[in-house]
Amino acid sequence: MNLFSSSILLSLTLLITPFIITTTKKYETHAYPYYVKNSIACAFMTSLVPMLMFLYTNQEMIISNWHWMTIHTMKLCLS
């Protein structure tokens, strides 16, 4: 993985953690809104790295293709 992919995955992980925390007792404390705010702020700061890399290279788009599964003769792809 390169820096672009790992930074995006880290940002998405930071955004998903408040949803996962709702299954624990930390969700019921008064510090939970601050935790969510800090998590979103960290995800934003982390997402600046791939955005600046994208702008610096003067790319206009990114094409990604993911082969999900094959059912008999039909290929399911996500792009």
Curated annotation (Swiss-Prot):
Reactions it catalyzes: a ubiquinone + NADH + 5 H(+)(in) = a ubiquinol + NAD(+) + 4 H(+)(out)
Entry EC number(s): 7.1.1.2
Keyword Transmembrane helix on entry: yes
GO CC term, one of those recorded: mitochondrial inner membrane
TM spans (from-to): 3-23, 43-63
Membrane topology, record value: Multi-pass membrane protein
Alphabetical UniProt keywords: Electron transport, Membrane, Mitochondrion, Mitochondrion inner membrane, NAD, Respiratory chain, Translocase, Transmembrane, Transmembrane helix, Transport, Ubiquinone
Localization terms from the record: Mitochondrion inner membrane
GO molecular function: NADH dehydrogenase (ubiquinone) activity
Chief location category: mitochondrion
Superkingdom assignment: Eukaryota
GO process terms (BP): mitochondrial electron transport, NADH to ubiquinone; mitochondrial respiratory chain complex I assembly
Quaternary context: Core subunit of respiratory chain NADH dehydrogenase (Complex I) which is composed of 45 different subunits.
The family this protein is said to belong to: Belongs to the complex I subunit 5 family.
Function, as annotated: Core subunit of the mitochondrial membrane respiratory chain NADH dehydrogenase (Complex I) which catalyzes electron transfer from NADH through the respiratory chain, using ubiquinone as an electron acceptor. Essential for the catalytic activity and assembly of complex I.
Protein name, entry field: NADH-ubiquinone oxidoreductase chain 5
